[in-house]
Swiss-Prot record:
Its EC number is 1.2.1.41. One of its GO terms (molecular function) is glutamate-5-semialdehyde dehydrogenase activity. It catalyses: L-glutamate 5-semialdehyde + phosphate + NADP(+) = L-glutamyl 5-phosphate + NADPH + H(+). The keyword Cytoplasm applies. Gene3D superfamilies: Aldehyde Dehydrogenase, Chain A, domain 1, Aldehyde Dehydrogenase, Chain A, domain 2. The gene is proA. It comes from the Bacteria. Catalyzes the NADPH-dependent reduction of L-glutamate 5-phosphate into L-glutamate 5-semialdehyde and phosphate. The product spontaneously undergoes cyclization to form 1-pyrroline-5-carboxylate. This is Gamma-glutamyl phosphate reductase. GO terms for cellular component: cytoplasm. Keywords: Amino-acid biosynthesis, Cytoplasm, NADP, Oxidoreductase, Proline biosynthesis.
Amino acid sequence: MLEQMGIAAKAASYKLALLSSGEKNRVLEKIADELEAQMESILSANVQDVEQARANGLSEAMLDRLALTPARLKAIADDVRQVCNLADPVGQVIDGGLLDSGLRLERRRVPLGVVGVIYEARPNVTVDVASLCLKTGNAVILRGGKETHRTNAATVRVIQKALKACGLPEAAVQAIDNPDRSLVNEMLRMDKYIDMLIPRGGAGLHKLCREQSTIPVITGGIGVCHIFVDSSADIAPALKIIVNAKTQRPSTCNTVETLLVHQDIAERFLPALSKQMAESGVTLHGDETVMQALHGPAKLVPLKPEELDNEFLSLDLNVVVVENMDGAIAHIREHGTQHSDAILTSDMHNAARFVNEVDSAAVYVNASTRFTDGGQFGLGAEVAVSTQKLHARGPMGLEALTTYKWIGFGDGTIRA
């Protein structure tokens, strides 16, 4: 089954690569229109997925990721339209020039070909990834989690209907709707057809892909994100940033999971933090210093060492008091996932040092980690947030779904 999907996807990719920007945008507009027109069928499938997931004991954080509403689906359709407004990188001449030999050389941006994406309970990923791949002239094979298989199947049917209406092969966007996990292992070995693989899920999925895939893999999305409250931080705006980074949408990978507090500000800062977190319903997981300093009003539990490596994806926040900037940077290097980390400070020397020494995909000064997002960065919807350094890093927009080719123009030109 998968080999036939691969053959069809590869054939579709050749046709997509030849489309003009206008032709690709017309497809995306049609997809957005169909998502709204077929909203009832997608939401009906999603209700079944959510009910099944709840019966299976899925956490509230995961249920939030899984659930669609009319407003969320409308926002997804609007995101597709936003992709239409983005500049098409395909065909862009990156650089080039005339060589001494007389050969005119250019480096031109081209589609990757076929992209494979493995993801868990995030139905919006289906549309986000499909729209970005189509905009860049790539075919895509999707493998969502079993929790979303009804939603994904309904969504892909809508996308394929739009493709067909525009005279394009339905195989440009395909989904593996069989929940059999052995198919993941088979997909990882489809290097004959898939040019790049992107896993979006937990550490176990990423480890499996790194170890078993014969396809180039871009991993990311695991966000043990930190905020360091420096000794010179302005407490009121710092609390506002922390509330946003923790509570706006706790189930996302750019949510802060560990707060590092400079010891020189801890006595003044921790009580204010506790009050604010109590109002926000956040449970604090405090180290020994925090446990001794606080006795309410926020719910407070002792921090377990293994929780420093946790991606809670819930209203839980580790709080650790550190001696100085060195301690904060060392902690992030040991426990961070190179996703998003921030410093809250009034000392621009410390800010510069933090930015230079924290090796994460996104580093912030006096701002929330929640900004690590394709839409917020002006990239449109994102296919993933890469925490590695090759071939993309941070939110992966359109350019991350392209490669380049060298093209030489001669006039009977030969090498001397």
